[in-house]
């Protein structure tokens, strides 16, 4: 995961200090890209321990089209707590846009099901895209989508995914985003009969919050370790049938967790 450490160093060395919505302050760069060959291991950060349970459950929650944090809380995941209202609702966030995008004629478009169908029918299509950025509903969302658009690409029997992330919390959020979309790529590859290719992560505003500088420098002192392997239950052929128990991580030997505060 040297690519991630290089991103963090790049932001520290070349970023611009800016004010931000949360009032914390950031150091920010605009436009950056990382690539991960999924054949080389599962890109789960090893220079600090990550909570895989949260990553898996959040992805399953997105895919279910859910926008209430009840499922997450029931499974010990607290990453969305700060943004939910008193009923646990977040508004029309990721899951709603992925699975039930509202069309002007009153229909609701299941982008994920459409994507799977297109990969199977026309894998060379350049329209294998899912968007969570709906300008008509952004103001109704508790938090507008940071990872807002992704595209799949099929070549030589391999499935690759590129994510465009408009806003990226490099220390806390990006490690989750890498693992989440890498896992999604493995899942989609399995159910469409393809092999995993690359995960390409493209950023708009990539930033370190000013209260994460010390933690970032600590992490940069750590040597990356061998990547783990993520195994999926081979029996699952329906993307929406995956459950938490269908994922097994092997060989994960990270450095200790580094605590940092979330800017809301």
Swiss-Prot record:
Cross-referenced InterPro entries, in alphabetical order?
A: Thymidate_synth/dCMP_Mease, Thymidate_synth/dCMP_Mease_dom, Thymidate_synth/dCMP_Mease_sf, Thymidylate_synthase, Thymidylate_synthase_AS
Keywords assigned by UniProt? Answer: Cytoplasm, Methyltransferase, Nucleotide biosynthesis, Transferase
Task: Specify which residues bind dUMP according to the UniProt entry for this protein.
Answer: 21, 126-127, 166-169, 177, 207-209
Q: What is its main location?
A: cytoplasm
EC number(s) given by UniProt: 2.1.1.45
Its UniProt pathway annotation is: Pyrimidine metabolism; dTTP biosynthesis
Key word Cytoplasm present in the record? Answer: yes
Reaction catalysis annotation: dUMP + (6R)-5,10-methylene-5,6,7,8-tetrahydrofolate = 7,8-dihydrofolate + dTMP
Places the protein is found: Cytoplasm
Family annotation (PROSITE patterns): THYMIDYLATE_SYNTHASE (PS00091)
Which is an annotated GO molecular function term of this record? thymidylate synthase activity
The first-level EC class reads transferase
Q: Which residues of this UniProt protein bind (6R)-5,10-methylene-5,6,7,8-tetrahydrofolate?
A: 51, 169, 263
Its GO biological process annotations read:
dTMP biosynthetic process; dTTP biosynthetic process; methylation
Which superkingdom, per the lineage?
A: Bacteria
Q: Which Pfam families match?
A: Thymidylat_synt
**Disulfide bridge map:** none
Give the UniProt entry's GO cellular component terms.
cytosol
Annotated function: Catalyzes the reductive methylation of 2'-deoxyuridine-5'-monophosphate (dUMP) to 2'-deoxythymidine-5'-monophosphate (dTMP) while utilizing 5,10-methylenetetrahydrofolate (mTHF) as the methyl donor and reductant in the reaction, yielding dihydrofolate (DHF) as a by-product. This enzymatic reaction provides an intracellular de novo source of dTMP, an essential precursor for DNA biosynthesis.
Q: What's this protein's family per the entry?
A: Belongs to the thymidylate synthase family. Bacterial-type ThyA subfamily.
Q: What is this protein called?
A: Thymidylate synthase
Q: Which organism is it from?
A: Laribacter hongkongensis (strain HLHK9)
Gene that specifies this protein? thyA
